[in-house]
Regions:
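N-terminal secretory signal peptides and thylakoid transit peptides that target proteins
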Residues: 1-20, 24-35
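N-terminal pre-ligand scaffold of iron-sulfur
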Residues: 31-97, 126-141
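Iron-sulfur (Fe-S) cluster-binding segments and ferredoxin-like electron-carrier domains
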Residues: 94-95, 108-115
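Short cysteine/histidine-rich metal-coordination sites, predominantly Zn2+-binding motifs
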Residues: 99-106, 117-125
Length: 141
């Protein structure tokens, strides 16, 4: 049976530790979202007379509901997109002064249609349909 001296042992230990560290470093560099994902099969209705939804009674107002941000744009139309930034999963906010969505985590900017205006977000926000009937706003996939 062959024995290992101290120098050889420490050398192999160092190589093994370096390989393990590199695996973790490069594993963390893989593209993709580490945060929550956009909701699928969305279908809900908001009663605009309910005080919980009062933010949508004013142009520039917005609210979050089940992973979706619903906003009433500065021109009075309703838009709905996933509330989670596609870069790191931060919660986006509606910016009425520039009529877009903004992620405060790393600065990504999205149009009201969800497309990326300014990264680092790699892909658009999922956009949902909206339909207003009287005082009921339906948001759906």
């Amino acid at each position: 049976m062959e024995t290992m001296d101290r120098k050889e042992f420490l050398s192999l230990l160092g190589i093994g530790s370096a390989a393990l560290a590199l695996t973790y470093c490069f594993g963390g560099c893989q593209p993709g979202n580490n945060g929550p994902t956009a909701p699928t099969n969305v279908d809900f209705t908001l009663d605009l007379t309910n005080s919980t939804n009062s933010a949508l009674n004013s142009n520039g107002g917005y609210l979050y509901h089940n992973g979706v941000i619903v906003a009433k744009t500065v021109n009075g139309s309703f838009v709905a997109v996933s509330q989670y930034c596609t870069h790191a999963g931060g919660t986006v906010v509606y910016s009425p002064n520039v009529n877009d969505f903004y992620c405060p985590v790393h600065g990504s900017v999205f149009s009201t249609g969800g497309s990326v205006i300014n990264g680092p977000a790699p892909s658009p926000l999922v956009k949902y349909n909206t339909s207003l009937t009287g005082t009921s706003l339906r948001v759906y996939s």
